[in-house]
Swiss-Prot record:
One BP term from GO: regulation of DNA recombination
An annotated Gene Ontology molecular function: double-stranded DNA binding
Chain's role: May be involved in recombination.
Keyword Cytoplasm: yes
UniProt keyword Cytoplasm, yes or no: yes
Keyword line: Cytoplasm, DNA recombination
Family per similarity comment: Belongs to the RdgC family.
Annotated Gene Ontology cellular component terms: bacterial nucleoid; cytoplasm
Protein name from the UniProt record: Recombination-associated protein RdgC
UniProt gene name: rdgC
PANTHER family: RECOMBINATION-ASSOCIATED PROTEIN RDGC
Principal localisation: cytoplasm
NCBIfam families: PRK00321.1-4, PRK00321.1-5
Localization annotation: Cytoplasm, Nucleoid
Organism per entry: Burkholderia orbicola (strain MC0-3)
Length: 307
């Protein structure tokens, strides 16, 4: 249930959209299996396999982005194209030109696609309409971009914005690494990456290693900055923070696992309980993280405009 990665985006808080409205927006873009000659197909699928494209609970929504892609390695296409080009050269008596080679490659691709295997990949999207968060469970930026593209296509005038905090995450992580501690109930763990901004970008990585203050000071004084930092929030959730505010390796700790509802009788009740627990904890953690980074600048702008 728990998201492993958090690609963060802001929505108006609160965002006055109901699950029924969301369902109507997504329905025209519901996932349909691709044809035999399509390389890729994307769309919205049911998060609970019950036909509904939106799962909702207590002003929290869960969506499921599905991508189906044909596995057709470029090496295979190139190999068949090369063999086909040799045949054509023998027939016509002269070397295949660039344009003809390109056309051959397209022809080979069209011939191989129907026989290629397909893989499906699902990516979850959490929408917190109460606190104004839209979070994509994706480690790769390219995947998050695909999800955002379909969101924008599905929802006309989607009021989506980036997270703009007052303090640079890189500067903050570097300071926390130097002091060995972070504010607001956060602690510094034992994974970090420091990188030089100079030519060559010298990089030092610590994995499961004590971050000694003297070592950190030496690296920072040499011009390195912290680009990744493992942290824990209130002994409840551990994660890795990055310069873009993408949060990776999200892991609920024992105190949260013990808070799971023991009275849940079936899969649906357990899902409801786990989703409520996850969204509640993550919403509080995100609010605390934004706070220790100086607050959300977009909120400040809106408050100033309202005044």
């Amino acid at each position: 249930m728990w998201f492993k990665n958090l690609q963060l985006h802001r929505l108006p808080a609160p965002w006055a959209v109901t699950p029924d409205q969301m369902e109507k927006w997504l329905a025209p873009h519901a996932f349909q299996p691709g044809s035999s000659v399509e390389m890729q197909r994307v769309g919205w699928a049911s998060p609970r396999d019950d036909g509904a494209l939106v799962y909702s609970n207590n002003r929290q929504m869960l969506l499921l982005f599905r991508a189906e892609k044909k596995l057709l390695p470029a090496s295979v296409v190139n190999q068949v194209t090369k063999a086909r080009a040799l045949e054509v050269e023998e027939q016509q008596g002269f070397k295949v030109g660039r344009k003809q080679l390109r056309e051959l490659k397209e022809q080979v691709t069209d011939e191989l696609l129907p026989r290629a295997f397909s893989i499906r990949r699902d990516t979850r999207v959490w929408i917190d309409t109460a606190n104004g968060w839209l979070v994509i469970d994706a480690a790769a930026q390219a995947l998050a971009d695909d999800v955002r593209s379909l969101l924008v296509k599905s929802i006309d005038q989607l009021p989506l914005a980036g997270v703009h905090v007052a303090r640079s995450p890189v500067a903050a992580m570097t300071d926390w690494l130097l002091s060995g501690e972070a504010p607001g109930g956060f602690t510094v763990d034992q994974d970090a990456e420091l990188r030089s901004s100079g030519e060559g970008g010298a990089t030092v990585r610590y994995v499961g290693h004590a971050l000694e203050a003297n070592d950190m000071r030496r690296h920072i004084e040499a011009g390195k900055q912290c680009m990744r930092l493992a942290m824990t929030w209130n002994d409840r959730i551990s994660f890795v923070l990055t310069p873009s505010l993408t949060i990776k390796r999200v892991t609920p700790l024992d105190v949260i696992k013990e808070a799971a509802d023991p009275t849940a009788q079936n899969d649906d009740e357990r899902f409801d309980s786990d989703f409520t627990l996850m969204t509640g904890e993550l919403a509080r953690m995100l609010a605390s993280l934004v706070d220790i980074l100086g607050g959300d600048q977009q909120d400040a702008i809106q408050q100033a405009a309202a005044a």
